[in-house]
Amino acid sequence: MANHNAEIEEIRKRQRAQGPANILAIGTATPSNCVYQADYPDYYFRITNSEHMSDLKLKFKRMCEKSMIRKRYMHITEEYLKENPNVCAYEAPSLDARQDLVVVEVPRLGKEAAAKAIKEWGHPKSKITHLIFCTTSGVDMPGADYQLTKLLGLRPSVKRFMMYQQGCFAGGTVLRLAKDLAENNTGARVLVVCSEITAVTFRGPSDSHLDSLVGQALFGDGAAAVIVGSDPDLSVERPLFQLISAAQTILPDSDGAIDGHLREVGLTFHLLKDVPGLISKNIEKSLKEAFGPIGISDWNSLFWIAHPGGPAILDQVELKLGLKEEKMRATRQVLSDYGNMSSACVLFILDEMRKKSIEEGKATTGDGLDWGVLFGFGPGLTVETVVLHSVPATITH
């Protein structure tokens, strides 16, 4: 028996990587249809036949002006909405029309982002051992993970994980899962794809549901992909960030703060409580738990990647923690250029940060700093906290 224990221990040792997980490449993609926030209220109320609701339109205009979003990308075009008028109503049976679109387009947009990440990574796609696919839309069987495997031509033996309808915190969830897979399977290379298309949540305005209108002012489409692995082969691979630790928590007294329900009318979105207040009130606890063991308590010494659920969340977190304005620069840039793309946002922000750090000649991929934090916020209220370590910035990234 003792002999077997030694053998098992040896097998376990061989199965595990030596070092921490690294993000080895990042790719992003958006649909070609770009909508400018300044023009959106007129378009939205016209296409949904709601121009008679002039007071509501004024409220929506103010929401769009306060959103800090300049433009967004959306797969659904005016042509699609004219062909599917039920999607434009606030509550009309429209799930089939929505599903038919997202089941095809979510994997397709994901493929575009994944292909860019694979190209940057530098290894053949046959070396991908695991796939994590995440989307808030389009439950189907076989899932978007299967469709992407086929579209990309990955090996049939790739180990797949499919995450549906987790919502806006899931960009942190996928990194947490990828870290565990990379560190516990020697040689593992995990392709992570978050692909989000708002066709499931788009709907016309309703006087009695202003929370739904908030979503219409914020949400955009986009896909992001990263490749995660431990013990990088430095002759080919160029690490961008190390994943040091990852945690998830449910905030106290936040039941029902953000809900989504899949119905015949599509995915309905409900914002029931003071979400920015709940997040800002609890965020320091998550920071202390994550950075206490490392001996860090100055939150301005970190580089920041925070899911931009909306400008009020970022404003209140900054205020509560006394963050300098530049801390959220990459986060606010992504919000301005793309809107809230749910799970994909934080991966877009990682991409923005490493690119800007190199362009501006910073010493590291993390805006010249060593340690950073990535936050996902979403339904629950659930918070994902990922501790990152940057690497020296070189032009080859």
UniProtKB/Swiss-Prot annotation:
For molecular function, the Gene Ontology terms on record are: naringenin-chalcone synthase activity
UniProt pathway annotation: Secondary metabolite biosynthesis; flavonoid biosynthesis
Q: Does the keyword Transferase apply?
A: yes
Its domain of life reads Eukaryota
From its record, what is one biological process in GO terms?
polyketide biosynthetic process
Q: Which Pfam families match?
A: Chal_sti_synt_C, Chal_sti_synt_N
Role description: The primary product of this enzyme is 4,2',4',6'-tetrahydroxychalcone (also termed naringenin-chalcone or chalcone) which can under specific conditions spontaneously isomerize into naringenin.
What is this protein identified as? Chalcone synthase 2
**Species of provenance:** Daucus carota
